[in-house]
Amino acid sequence: MKQITFAPRNHLLTNTNTWTPDSQWLVFDVRPSGASFTGESIERVNIHTGEVEVIYRASQGAHVGVVTVHPKSEKYVFIHGPENPDETWHYDFHHRRGVIVEGGKMSNLDAMDITAPYTPGVLRGGSHVHVFSPNGERVSFTYNDHVMHELDPALDLRNVGVAAPFGPVNVQKQHPREYSGSHWC
């Protein structure tokens, strides 16, 4: 057994699917405080050499974390908090999304539509703990609903969802925080 990260910061592994398909790298997020969702990068470390690479760096005040790896290719999925957070829209269970990074390019996994009439295949809130299926075609996640939270926070119960590769799913934006995604949820 050996330690492979040494930088003076918190390195957090998700509790599943953190190995790259070649079993040479572990992926993690980096947080100033281990208890807060305030990390700005998704990274990986080579278990033999200790080399660290940044997979993704957030911008515009967004935070990222809870990364997992595709079982067959170098594709990463993780939580991305809102860009340009403010008093009314900041990181929260119902204000986050799943994103996929492949080949250095980031795309939204899930879409969000919080304005009626709602778009089929689109979430109304935030997703969390994204994990690829064993064949890599689907992604499981947990989910909190912004619309239900606005109605009554007690109604915003966490649910389990699946993102299927039947996208893209395009949202006709009626709210500045709505967005399109690559998968049907």
Report the location of each language-model feature.
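Sequence signature of WD/YWTD-type beta-propeller architectures
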Residues: 1-185
